[in-house]
Protein backbone atom coordinates (compact mmCIF):
# COMPACT_ATOMS: atom_id res chain seq x y z
CA UNK A 1 0.00 0.00 0.00
CA UNK A 2 1.16 3.50 -0.70
CA UNK A 3 0.77 6.57 1.48
CA UNK A 4 -2.78 7.08 0.22
CA UNK A 5 -3.84 4.03 2.21
CA UNK A 6 -2.04 5.04 5.38
CA UNK A 7 -4.17 6.83 7.99
CA UNK A 8 -2.69 10.14 9.05
CA UNK A 9 -2.05 10.60 12.73
CA UNK A 10 -4.03 13.58 13.96
CA UNK A 11 -0.92 15.26 15.37
CA UNK A 12 2.14 13.98 13.49
CA UNK A 13 4.52 16.05 15.63
CA UNK A 14 3.39 14.31 18.82
CA UNK A 15 2.34 10.90 17.52
CA UNK A 16 5.04 8.45 16.54
CA UNK A 17 2.89 5.39 15.94
CA UNK A 18 0.99 4.92 12.69
CA UNK A 19 -2.71 4.11 12.68
CA UNK A 20 -4.19 1.42 10.44
CA UNK A 21 -7.50 0.22 9.00
CA UNK A 22 -9.93 -2.30 10.44
CA UNK A 23 -11.01 -5.47 8.69
CA UNK A 24 -14.42 -3.82 8.35
CA UNK A 25 -12.98 -0.86 6.45
CA UNK A 26 -11.01 -3.18 4.16
CA UNK A 27 -14.10 -5.33 3.52
CA UNK A 28 -16.15 -2.24 2.70
CA UNK A 29 -13.59 -0.94 0.22
CA UNK A 30 -13.24 -4.37 -1.38
CA UNK A 31 -17.03 -4.64 -1.65
CA UNK A 32 -17.28 -1.22 -3.31
CA UNK A 33 -14.63 -2.20 -5.84
CA UNK A 34 -16.25 -5.57 -6.56
CA UNK A 35 -19.76 -4.15 -7.00
CA UNK A 36 -18.48 -1.35 -9.23
CA UNK A 37 -16.71 -3.91 -11.41
CA UNK A 38 -19.79 -6.15 -11.47
CA UNK A 39 -21.83 -3.26 -12.88
CA UNK A 40 -19.28 -1.48 -15.09
CA UNK A 41 -16.68 -4.14 -15.84
CA UNK A 42 -13.91 -1.97 -14.39
CA UNK A 43 -12.32 -1.99 -10.94
CA UNK A 44 -11.66 1.37 -9.27
CA UNK A 45 -8.07 1.30 -8.04
CA UNK A 46 -7.41 2.86 -5.61
CA UNK A 47 -10.89 2.73 -4.13
CA UNK A 48 -12.07 5.29 -1.59
CA UNK A 49 -14.71 4.98 1.12
CA UNK A 50 -16.19 7.30 3.74
CA UNK A 51 -15.70 6.08 7.30
CA UNK A 52 -18.24 6.68 10.10
CA UNK A 53 -16.34 9.73 11.40
CA UNK A 54 -15.87 11.26 7.96
CA UNK A 55 -12.36 10.12 7.02
CA UNK A 56 -11.91 9.19 3.34
CA UNK A 57 -9.14 6.60 2.99
CA UNK A 58 -8.08 5.09 -0.33
CA UNK A 59 -7.06 1.46 -0.73
CA UNK A 60 -5.09 -0.22 -3.48
CA UNK A 61 -6.46 -3.52 -4.72
CA UNK A 62 -4.31 -6.59 -4.19
CA UNK A 63 -6.69 -8.91 -6.02
CA UNK A 64 -9.26 -8.57 -8.81
CA UNK A 65 -11.55 -11.20 -10.31
CA UNK A 66 -14.42 -10.78 -12.76
CA UNK A 67 -16.55 -13.67 -13.98
CA UNK A 68 -19.99 -14.48 -15.30
CA UNK A 69 -22.36 -12.85 -12.83
CA UNK A 70 -19.85 -12.10 -10.06
CA UNK A 71 -16.90 -9.89 -9.19
CA UNK A 72 -14.18 -10.21 -6.53
CA UNK A 73 -11.79 -7.68 -5.04
CA UNK A 74 -9.17 -8.06 -2.34
CA UNK A 75 -7.30 -5.62 -0.11
CA UNK A 76 -4.31 -6.36 2.13
CA UNK A 77 -5.04 -5.13 5.64
CA UNK A 78 -2.60 -2.56 7.01
CA UNK A 79 -2.95 -2.31 10.79
CA UNK A 80 -0.33 0.44 11.00
CA UNK A 81 1.91 0.02 14.03
CA UNK A 82 -0.64 -1.96 16.01
CA UNK A 83 0.39 -5.58 16.76
CA UNK A 84 -2.82 -6.82 15.14
CA UNK A 85 -2.85 -10.52 14.21
CA UNK A 86 -4.81 -9.69 11.04
CA UNK A 87 -2.13 -7.30 9.76
CA UNK A 88 -1.14 -8.39 6.26
CA UNK A 89 -4.22 -10.57 5.74
CA UNK A 90 -6.06 -10.24 2.44
CA UNK A 91 -9.72 -9.28 2.84
CA UNK A 92 -11.68 -10.44 -0.22
CA UNK A 93 -15.24 -9.51 -1.13
CA UNK A 94 -17.20 -11.50 -3.70
CA UNK A 95 -20.41 -9.85 -4.91
CA UNK A 96 -23.14 -11.33 -7.09
CA UNK A 97 -26.84 -10.61 -7.67
CA UNK A 98 -29.45 -12.06 -5.32
CA UNK A 99 -33.08 -12.90 -6.21
CA UNK A 100 -35.32 -9.82 -6.50
CA UNK A 101 -36.58 -8.48 -3.20
CA UNK A 102 -34.05 -10.24 -0.98
CA UNK A 103 -31.97 -7.16 -0.20
CA UNK A 104 -28.35 -7.55 0.84
CA UNK A 105 -27.22 -10.90 2.23
CA UNK A 106 -23.89 -11.38 4.00
CA UNK A 107 -22.08 -14.71 3.95
CA UNK A 108 -18.90 -16.03 5.53
CA UNK A 109 -16.37 -17.26 3.02
CA UNK A 110 -13.08 -19.01 3.64
CA UNK A 111 -11.43 -17.79 6.83
CA UNK A 112 -14.37 -15.75 8.15
CA UNK A 113 -16.12 -17.12 11.21
CA UNK A 114 -19.71 -18.09 11.83
CA UNK A 115 -21.45 -17.18 15.09
CA UNK A 116 -22.68 -20.22 17.06
CA UNK A 117 -23.60 -18.78 20.47
CA UNK A 118 -26.12 -16.28 21.78
CA UNK A 119 -24.98 -13.04 23.37
CA UNK A 120 -23.09 -11.41 20.51
CA UNK A 121 -24.29 -8.54 18.32
CA UNK A 122 -24.81 -11.01 15.47
CA UNK A 123 -27.22 -13.95 15.95
CA UNK A 124 -26.12 -17.60 15.73
CA UNK A 125 -25.83 -18.96 12.22
CA UNK A 126 -24.77 -15.63 10.74
CA UNK A 127 -21.39 -14.61 9.35
CA UNK A 128 -19.18 -12.95 11.97
CA UNK A 129 -19.40 -9.58 10.28
CA UNK A 130 -20.17 -6.98 12.92
CA UNK A 131 -22.99 -4.41 12.69
CA UNK A 132 -20.94 -1.35 11.68
CA UNK A 133 -19.12 -3.08 8.77
CA UNK A 134 -22.49 -4.52 7.66
CA UNK A 135 -23.99 -1.04 7.70
CA UNK A 136 -21.03 0.47 5.85
CA UNK A 137 -21.21 -2.16 3.12
CA UNK A 138 -24.99 -1.92 2.88
CA UNK A 139 -24.95 1.86 2.54
CA UNK A 140 -22.24 1.88 -0.11
CA UNK A 141 -23.94 -0.87 -2.12
CA UNK A 142 -27.31 0.87 -1.96
CA UNK A 143 -25.71 4.13 -3.13
CA UNK A 144 -23.94 2.47 -6.07
CA UNK A 145 -27.05 0.55 -7.12
CA UNK A 146 -29.16 3.72 -6.91
CA UNK A 147 -26.63 5.54 -9.10
CA UNK A 148 -27.12 2.94 -11.84
CA UNK A 149 -30.86 2.49 -11.30
CA UNK A 150 -30.49 -1.08 -10.06
CA UNK A 151 -32.12 -2.87 -7.11
CA UNK A 152 -29.77 -3.50 -4.18
CA UNK A 153 -30.38 -7.26 -4.12
CA UNK A 154 -26.93 -8.73 -3.58
CA UNK A 155 -25.00 -11.52 -1.90
CA UNK A 156 -21.74 -10.32 -0.34
CA UNK A 157 -19.29 -13.03 0.71
CA UNK A 158 -16.26 -11.93 2.71
CA UNK A 159 -13.24 -14.25 2.71
CA UNK A 160 -9.84 -14.10 4.39
CA UNK A 161 -7.38 -16.75 3.17
CA UNK A 162 -5.63 -18.16 6.23
CA UNK A 163 -8.25 -16.64 8.50
CA UNK A 164 -9.02 -19.91 10.26
CA UNK A 165 -5.41 -20.14 11.42
CA UNK A 166 -5.33 -16.45 12.40
CA UNK A 167 -8.50 -16.94 14.46
CA UNK A 168 -6.71 -19.41 16.72
CA UNK A 169 -4.67 -16.43 17.98
CA UNK A 170 -7.87 -14.58 18.91
CA UNK A 171 -10.68 -15.20 21.38
CA UNK A 172 -13.12 -16.21 18.64
CA UNK A 173 -13.07 -19.93 19.54
CA UNK A 174 -13.99 -19.12 23.16
CA UNK A 175 -16.75 -16.79 22.02
CA UNK A 176 -18.25 -19.52 19.86
CA UNK A 177 -17.18 -17.99 16.54
CA UNK A 178 -15.95 -20.89 14.45
CA UNK A 179 -14.17 -21.18 11.12
CA UNK A 180 -12.26 -17.92 11.04
CA UNK A 181 -11.85 -14.33 12.12
CA UNK A 182 -14.48 -11.66 12.64
CA UNK A 183 -14.89 -8.62 10.42
CA UNK A 184 -14.71 -5.83 12.96
CA UNK A 185 -14.54 -2.11 13.49
CA UNK A 186 -16.69 0.74 14.72
CA UNK A 187 -14.72 3.68 13.31
CA UNK A 188 -12.77 1.95 10.55
CA UNK A 189 -9.47 3.06 12.09
CA UNK A 190 -7.07 0.93 14.15
CA UNK A 191 -5.34 2.99 16.82
CA UNK A 192 -1.99 1.45 17.84
CA UNK A 193 -2.02 -0.34 21.17
CA UNK A 194 -5.57 0.82 21.86
CA UNK A 195 -7.14 -0.65 25.00
CA UNK A 196 -10.66 -0.28 23.63
CA UNK A 197 -10.58 -3.36 21.39
CA UNK A 198 -9.37 -5.56 24.26
CA UNK A 199 -11.99 -4.22 26.66
CA UNK A 200 -14.64 -4.71 23.98
CA UNK A 201 -13.67 -8.40 23.76
CA UNK A 202 -14.04 -8.69 27.55
CA UNK A 203 -17.55 -7.28 27.34
CA UNK A 204 -18.52 -9.64 24.53
CA UNK A 205 -17.19 -12.56 26.57
CA UNK A 206 -19.43 -11.59 29.48
CA UNK A 207 -22.39 -11.22 27.12
CA UNK A 208 -21.83 -14.71 25.73
CA UNK A 209 -21.50 -16.23 29.21
CA UNK A 210 -24.71 -14.54 30.38
CA UNK A 211 -26.61 -15.64 27.29
CA UNK A 212 -25.50 -19.22 27.91
CA UNK A 213 -26.71 -19.06 31.52
CA UNK A 214 -23.18 -19.45 32.85
CA UNK A 215 -23.09 -18.69 36.59
CA UNK A 216 -19.31 -18.62 37.11
CA UNK A 217 -16.67 -16.84 35.03
CA UNK A 218 -12.90 -16.57 35.31
CA UNK A 219 -10.70 -13.58 34.57
CA UNK A 220 -6.96 -14.23 34.67
CA UNK A 221 -3.96 -11.97 34.25
CA UNK A 222 -2.11 -14.60 32.21
CA UNK A 223 -1.99 -18.21 31.11
CA UNK A 224 -0.18 -19.48 34.23
CA UNK A 225 -2.83 -18.21 36.64
CA UNK A 226 -5.59 -19.23 34.23
CA UNK A 227 -4.30 -22.80 34.16
CA UNK A 228 -4.11 -22.87 37.97
CA UNK A 229 -7.73 -21.76 38.30
CA UNK A 230 -8.89 -24.10 35.57
CA UNK A 231 -7.28 -27.00 37.40
CA UNK A 232 -9.79 -26.25 40.16
CA UNK A 233 -12.89 -25.53 38.10
CA UNK A 234 -12.52 -26.78 34.51
CA UNK A 235 -14.88 -24.07 33.29
CA UNK A 236 -16.10 -24.12 29.68
CA UNK A 237 -14.12 -21.98 27.24
CA UNK A 238 -16.81 -19.33 27.01
CA UNK A 239 -16.62 -18.78 30.79
CA UNK A 240 -12.98 -17.64 30.56
CA UNK A 241 -12.73 -13.89 30.06
CA UNK A 242 -9.92 -12.21 28.16
CA UNK A 243 -9.01 -10.08 31.19
CA UNK A 244 -5.24 -9.70 31.09
CA UNK A 245 -4.36 -6.38 32.70
CA UNK A 246 -7.89 -4.99 32.44
CA UNK A 247 -9.45 -5.97 35.75
CA UNK A 248 -11.48 -2.78 35.60
CA UNK A 249 -12.88 -3.77 32.22
CA UNK A 250 -14.27 -6.94 33.80
CA UNK A 251 -15.52 -5.44 37.06
CA UNK A 252 -17.16 -2.32 35.65
CA UNK A 253 -19.08 -4.31 33.04
CA UNK A 254 -20.16 -6.93 35.58
CA UNK A 255 -21.44 -4.07 37.72
CA UNK A 256 -24.14 -3.47 35.09
CA UNK A 257 -24.32 -7.02 33.68
CA UNK A 258 -23.81 -9.29 36.70
CA UNK A 259 -22.91 -12.97 36.77
CA UNK A 260 -23.28 -14.89 40.03
CA UNK A 261 -19.62 -15.66 40.60
CA UNK A 262 -16.32 -14.19 39.42
CA UNK A 263 -12.90 -15.70 40.02
CA UNK A 264 -9.95 -13.39 39.43
CA UNK A 265 -6.66 -15.27 39.18
CA UNK A 266 -3.28 -13.65 38.81
CA UNK A 267 0.35 -13.50 39.73
CA UNK A 268 1.45 -11.92 42.99
CA UNK A 269 2.68 -8.65 41.45
CA UNK A 270 -0.42 -8.07 39.32
CA UNK A 271 -2.78 -8.72 42.20
CA UNK A 272 -0.72 -6.50 44.49
CA UNK A 273 -1.62 -3.65 42.13
CA UNK A 274 -5.29 -4.62 42.33
CA UNK A 275 -4.97 -4.71 46.12
CA UNK A 276 -3.59 -1.16 45.97
CA UNK A 277 -6.71 -0.08 44.09
CA UNK A 278 -5.39 -0.12 40.51
CA UNK A 279 -7.83 -1.42 37.90
CA UNK A 280 -5.39 -1.34 34.97
CA UNK A 281 -2.57 -3.71 35.89
CA UNK A 282 -0.21 -2.98 32.98
CA UNK A 283 3.33 -2.07 34.01
CA UNK A 284 3.20 1.22 32.10
CA UNK A 285 0.04 2.36 33.87
CA UNK A 286 0.40 1.10 37.44
CA UNK A 287 3.33 0.13 39.64
CA UNK A 288 3.77 -1.92 42.78
CA UNK A 289 4.11 0.30 45.85
CA UNK A 290 6.82 -1.19 48.10
CA UNK A 291 5.56 0.96 50.96
CA UNK A 292 2.19 -0.72 50.62
CA UNK A 293 3.86 -4.14 50.69
CA UNK A 294 5.76 -3.17 53.83
CA UNK A 295 2.48 -2.21 55.53
CA UNK A 296 1.04 -5.61 54.60
CA UNK A 297 4.17 -7.41 55.80
CA UNK A 298 4.30 -5.42 59.04
CA UNK A 299 0.68 -6.30 59.85
CA UNK A 300 1.51 -9.93 59.11
CA UNK A 301 4.32 -9.86 61.68
CA UNK A 302 7.44 -8.88 59.75
CA UNK A 303 10.17 -7.44 62.00
CA UNK A 304 11.11 -3.77 61.71
CA UNK A 305 14.54 -4.77 60.46
CA UNK A 306 12.99 -6.05 57.25
CA UNK A 307 11.45 -2.69 56.30
CA UNK A 308 14.46 -1.31 54.45
CA UNK A 309 14.99 -4.55 52.52
CA UNK A 310 11.37 -4.50 51.38
CA UNK A 311 11.45 -0.82 50.41
CA UNK A 312 14.64 -1.35 48.40
CA UNK A 313 13.54 -4.60 46.76
CA UNK A 314 13.62 -4.62 42.97
CA UNK A 315 10.36 -6.50 42.45
CA UNK A 316 7.21 -7.61 44.20
CA UNK A 317 8.38 -11.21 43.88
CA UNK A 318 11.56 -10.33 45.76
CA UNK A 319 9.40 -8.99 48.59
CA UNK A 320 7.33 -12.17 48.54
CA UNK A 321 10.44 -14.34 48.75
CA UNK A 322 11.84 -12.25 51.61
CA UNK A 323 8.70 -12.69 53.67
CA UNK A 324 8.40 -16.37 52.79
CA UNK A 325 11.97 -16.90 53.99
CA UNK A 326 10.89 -16.00 57.55
CA UNK A 327 7.56 -17.79 57.38
CA UNK A 328 5.33 -14.75 56.89
CA UNK A 329 2.38 -14.92 54.51
CA UNK A 330 1.63 -11.72 52.60
CA UNK A 331 -0.14 -13.39 49.67
CA UNK A 332 -3.24 -14.01 51.78
CA UNK A 333 -3.60 -10.38 52.90
CA UNK A 334 -2.95 -9.23 49.33
CA UNK A 335 -5.75 -11.50 48.10
CA UNK A 336 -8.11 -10.04 50.72
CA UNK A 337 -7.23 -6.47 49.76
CA UNK A 338 -7.62 -7.30 46.05
CA UNK A 339 -11.04 -8.76 46.79
CA UNK A 340 -12.00 -5.54 48.59
CA UNK A 341 -10.98 -3.50 45.53
CA UNK A 342 -13.11 -5.75 43.34
CA UNK A 343 -16.14 -5.51 45.61
CA UNK A 344 -15.78 -1.74 45.87
CA UNK A 345 -15.68 -1.47 42.08
CA UNK A 346 -18.77 -3.68 41.72
CA UNK A 347 -20.68 -1.23 43.97
CA UNK A 348 -23.04 -3.79 45.41
CA UNK A 349 -23.74 -5.72 42.22
CA UNK A 350 -24.81 -9.31 43.02
CA UNK A 351 -21.47 -10.89 42.13
CA UNK A 352 -19.56 -13.21 44.46
CA UNK A 353 -15.82 -12.57 44.08
CA UNK A 354 -12.97 -15.02 44.59
CA UNK A 355 -9.29 -14.11 44.32
CA UNK A 356 -6.57 -16.65 43.52
CA UNK A 357 -2.92 -15.56 43.83
CA UNK A 358 -0.28 -17.70 42.10
CA UNK A 359 3.47 -17.76 41.85
CA UNK A 360 5.38 -17.88 38.56
CA UNK A 361 5.07 -21.66 38.39
CA UNK A 362 1.31 -21.61 38.88
CA UNK A 363 1.34 -22.74 42.49
CA UNK A 364 -1.56 -21.24 44.43
CA UNK A 365 -0.29 -18.93 47.17
CA UNK A 366 -3.67 -17.68 48.38
CA UNK A 367 -7.33 -18.23 47.63
CA UNK A 368 -10.05 -16.14 49.26
Swiss-Prot record:
Its EC number is 2.1.1.195. It comes from the Bacteria. It catalyses: Co-precorrin-5B + S-adenosyl-L-methionine = Co-precorrin-6A + S-adenosyl-L-homocysteine. HAMAP family: CbiD. It comes from Brucella abortus (strain 2308). Gene3D superfamilies: CbiD-like. The gene is cbiD. GO terms for biological process: anaerobic cobalamin biosynthetic process; methylation. Pathway: Cofactor biosynthesis; adenosylcobalamin biosynthesis; cob(II)yrinate a,c-diamide from sirohydrochlorin (anaerobic route): step 6/10. Belongs to the CbiD family. This is Cobalt-precorrin-5B C(1)-methyltransferase.
Amino acid sequence: MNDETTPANKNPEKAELRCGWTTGACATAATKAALTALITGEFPDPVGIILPKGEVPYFQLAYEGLGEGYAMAGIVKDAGDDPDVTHGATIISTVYPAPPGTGIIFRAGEGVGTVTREGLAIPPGEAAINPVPRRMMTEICEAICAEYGLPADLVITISVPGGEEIAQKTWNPRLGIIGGISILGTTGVVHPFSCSAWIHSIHRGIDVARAAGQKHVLGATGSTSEDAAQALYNLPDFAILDMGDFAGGVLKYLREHPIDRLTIAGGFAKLTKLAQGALDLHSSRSQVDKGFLWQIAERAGAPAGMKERILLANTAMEVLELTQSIGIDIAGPIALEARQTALKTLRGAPVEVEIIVTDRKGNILARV
